[in-house]
Amino acid sequence: LGEQTGRQGIERYYEHLLRGVKGKRFLQKDRFNRIIGPYERGIFDIPSKGSKNLILTLDLELQKYGEQLLKNKRGGIVVIEPQTGEVLSLVSAPSYDPNLLVGRMRSKNYRKLALDTISKPLFDRGLQAQYAPGSPFKTLNALIALQEGVINSNTTYKCNQGHFYAKGMFMDCHCKYGTHNNLLSGIYRSCNTYFANIYRKIIDDSGNGVHEGINIWKTHLISFGLGNYLGYDLPIGKKGFIPDASYYDYWYKKGG
């Protein structure tokens, strides 16, 4: 019988550790094909090496809770222990029953899942999907602005419950009308207006013009590890996308 081989996920990545190493024994037989003992006292034998154990760090209750949150929704949840990098929960929805991919019907079930172009249950949104960053991204822009010297901790902006970022385009903010925020209160309140102004300062004042400012901003983000593969122990993933000046030129036309 053939040996089972890890083909996907964790089993694939750690196949070399989970498999172990086969051993060999050389035996001596008589003319009646009966074993009479080890050949040359076993000096050519190769001992086998047992496979290593693999312990997942998933928190079962947290995993169940994440799956409940994404029931009848599309999205992904990744929960990581910052101090160790352990993955406590990894959820993708819509999902599928893993039992469908074992047994005699696995090929038929796989084709059915692969052909579902609406729900895409085989697409791991926790590892492969690309989403716009949320409010934690604001702190990176704050660090970049401080590094470039375009703001300091006392830089203050007024928030009128949002701001215009294009012609007729308004982004709401939960800050009260007329709130003045410096860097610390802007982070504390997660003020959209404050960090929109910080981003504009980075782009306008970091380099010699907007193009250079955008590219400087991107360089800083790459230094934080964004836009790169994480190097984790799963064989799939996306490195993310950070736009540069040429991207904006393409979509908004140079000088527009």
Residue ranges with predicted function:
Residues L17-G20, L69, Q130, K201:
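Mid-sequence acidic-hydrophobic segments that form the walls
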Residues D30-D45, Q83-P136, L140-G256:
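Beta-lactam-recognizing serine transpeptidase/beta-lactamase-like catalytic domain environment
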Residues L1, I55-T57, G76-I80, L88-S92, ...:
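Soluble periplasmic/extracytoplasmic beta-strand elements of cell-envelope proteins
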Residues I35-G76, I80-Q83:
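Conserved, well-ordered alpha-helix/loop/beta-strand core segments that scaffold catalytic motifs
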Residues L1-S51, S89:
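Small/polar-residue-rich segments within soluble enzyme cores
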